Swiss-Prot record:
Tissue spec: Broadly expressed. Detected in developing veins of the leaf and root. Detected in roots, hypocotyls, cotyledons, leaves, siliques and shoot apical meristems.
Expression induction: Up-regulated by auxin.
Domain PH: residue ranges: 292-430
Organism name: Arabidopsis thaliana
UniProt cross-references to SMART domains, sorted A to Z: ANK, ArfGap, BAR, PH
Note: Binds to phosphatidylinositol (PI), phosphatidylinositol 4-monophosphate (PIP) and phosphatidylinositol 4,5-bisphosphate (PIP2) but not to phosphatidic acid (PA), phosphatidylcholine (PC) or phosphatidylethanolamine (PE).
Subunit comment: Homodimer. Interacts with DRP1A. Interacts with VAB.
Arf-GAP domain mapped to chain residues: 501-643
Protein name: ADP-ribosylation factor GTPase-activating protein AGD3
Protein's GO biological process: endocytosis; leaf morphogenesis; phloem or xylem histogenesis; response to auxin; xylem and phloem pattern formation
Amino acid sequence: MHFTKLDDSPMFRKQLQSMEESAEILRERSLKFYKGCRKYTEGLGEAYDGDIAFASALETFGGGHNDPISVAFGGPVMTKFTIALREIGTYKEVLRSQVEHILNDRLLQFANMDLHEVKEARKRFDKASLTYDQAREKFLSLRKGTKSDVAAALEQELHTSRSMFEQARFNLVTALSNVEAKKRFEFLEAVSGTMDAHLRYFKQGYELLHQMEPYINQVLTYAQQSRERSNYEQAALNEKMQEYKRQVDRESRWGSNGSNGSPNGDGIQAIGRSSHKMIDAVMQSAARGKVQTIRQGYLSKRSSNLRGDWKRRFFVLDSRGMLYYYRKQCSKPSGSGSQLSGQRNSSELGSGLLSRWLSSNNHGHGGVHDEKSVARHTVNLLTSTIKVDADQSDLRFCFRIISPTKNYTLQAESALDQMDWIEKITGVIASLLSSQVPEQRLPGSPMGSGHHRSASESSSYESSEYDHPTTEEFVCERSFLGYNERPSRSFQPQRSIRKGEKPIDALRKVCGNDKCADCGAPEPDWASLNLGVLVCIECSGVHRNLGVHISKVRSLTLDVKVWEPSVISLFQALGNTFANTVWEELLHSRSAIHFDPGLTVSDKSRVMVTGKPSYADMISIKEKYIQAKYAEKLFVRRSRDSDFPQSAAQQMWDAVSGNDKKAVYRLIVNGDADVNYVYDQTSSSSLTLSRVILVPERPKREDVLLRLRNELLDRTGSSSNISPEGSGGSSLLHCACEKADLGMVELLLQYGANVNASDSSGQTPLHCCLLRGKVTIARLLLTRGADPEAMNREGKTALDIAAESNFTDPEVLALLSDTNGYNHRQC
């Protein structure tokens, strides 16, 4: 108790005064504290505005998914961080509101109401005390002879004033007691409540960022990998530039030390057999509308006017036999073609960057071209010949192209450059003459019909890499084997990515790929290449911890280069729904658990009590489930020998022959089938033939084998298919290269198929592709480590086989020639 006695006494008055002084000091302190708290809340408000401004700036900087510049530096990834930043800003705004309500408002109320009430009570007490003193003096100053009614009135006034005085005194005591009581809890409660608000603020922020930690780590890892790749690419670029400088120096020294003149000879010069073959192969590609650049670079051209001045022009020799040049330097286009105007020489017999750029401009601009980007048609080489040196000119490195309509005098920049131009033009003329292409079928200009190619043959990224690989391969196979009937079901074109469609959009259309294969989270944006499933970012972190021997995790949005046509074809053939029927078969079929021979008693009990997690479950639950699902194969039903009359190897062979990716996938997962299984001559080659094993009488079996083989040869018109008599030592990859498609080859490679395996004839899968015109599969094998220098039993390499089998794909030929020493590119 603050007041032991309530009697009005000097000690009581002194105690009141002391408490009032303490209350006034507390009021001043409270107001100062309030000013500091208000400044703090204003700072929180400014910090919230700063957070929102930072998030908005990051969102603007990151751009959108359709912005190519944004995608190049990871803008879509950064945009995801803006959501977290805005959420953190919201937490900060909530903190500011709580501090203002819990601390600022209570401080202001305590100072302006509770402490102010003490002052008001003191004023009322002083006024009542004065009134009471006056009434008491009047009453005590009465004489004895005062009338009774006057005395009664003064006595009543004294009683009233005393009551008012006592009431005012107790009101002051109440106000002071209230202040003293609130001192014990008001400030502690306000400050501790403020700290609790801070605790919740930081806890919410931690939980939010902790949930994003796997994604942040993935982005950091990807950024580090990108840094390493960039350093490697920069070093490779520097090496290329140094090599270019060394090549220029060698050419300069060769030109200065060599002949001052030019080689003599008229007409068509003899060129190397290998170079002639390669030029001829590229020339043949023009028949399918694929225009390739054989040679391009700068030449000086003498004008036909009286002055005969020389002007530097950029000439292009393409696979249609056309030689044309640019009147002016190319205007800077969008895309990779922007650097062509500064390029002296380019790769030959390659992909033809300039023709690609011209083609893309034709399709992209509807044939309307600026003068700066239009190539001027020069000459049809079919009716032309070459003469070395200029007519009546003592200049070095000159040569002439003589045609029925016009003569062109050209000057190269060195003797080596001159010889190379003459060799390439001579080779083109020889190829044109040998093929006897009618004059009227040749395009009239570089911008003519030769460039009006279909979308599937465009050189853009979307069309060149993703447009109908199965269809293209089948057309090539028909041209090699002479098929006349309709293609079988196994070679029907699969679903492919439409032009401009992103891999993530195409793969999410596959059954079950709209949800994570492991937890069911919507819109998964990560994938396991070898498992063929789409997973969310949280499950992808668990997959990464399993190791690449179990799951090869890649991002659908970050790892753009991974999503080749073969990988996309494989994913479209599988899907999360099918993959889970293999990996979770026992999980959804409890009755099969008791009959699975591969499960122990403890494993069976684990399967019975284990359930599939949801995306809201803790990461530890998902880790245990994914570990059991893929690493331990706890929910996979093991294949038994009694399930099928055939061996696992024979089933694999039949599935690959039938292009049944799902069956191959199931056999690999269920029975750990050997993808490097080698076909034995004593085994059968197809599901139809394998059924003959069940026939009891051997003579009848042999008759059926012979009849089926003859029917097979009658249908195809060729004996190139793998058969029991001619497939000794063939691997599953050999079989896939001949009978399956790109996705099947990708599936076998993902599970460790030997890309350089050879059969009894020494033929590798690459050799088989070249023999049968499998263009896309040949490209895939070369990019996955196929050895172009491997020889068969006859000592022939892949390039030799391609030359003999009239294989005409320029990209594959360029890859083969680079390895075998036929690289004719001028750096």
